[in-house]
Amino acid sequence: SKFVPIAAGGGGIPVVIKDNNLQGVAGVIDKDFSAAKLAEDIQADELVILTTVDNAYVNYNQPDQAPIGKVKVDQLKKYLEAGQFAAGSMKPKIEAVINFVEKTGNTAIITSLRNASKLDDGVGTIVYN
């Protein structure tokens, strides 16, 4: 198979041993950033982040909403700086793919789970250098 699923972050409770007991500690791991870091560390050819929408969008949920298709990382950074992406939603995904593309020079894709089988067809938001 040419696809290797990568999953990281979320779902665990971080603990430390204190006085011979396990004690929960605050620790939040962003799934998008950890997936991008893992993809970078294993030298993945491509990072794919699956979400509930087919693309990232400019002017999301506005009358002039428009999907972002193939986009250079520099343009995506401009959209990010303009506040186009919601914190805690699309923003961390955008930041993660920007970091991955800038550090590796490889491509990243944000799309929906239903599009996962169509990646070779150019679906989703495709971020490149």
Model feature map: region roles:
Residues S1-N129:
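C-terminal catalytic "cap/lid" subdomain
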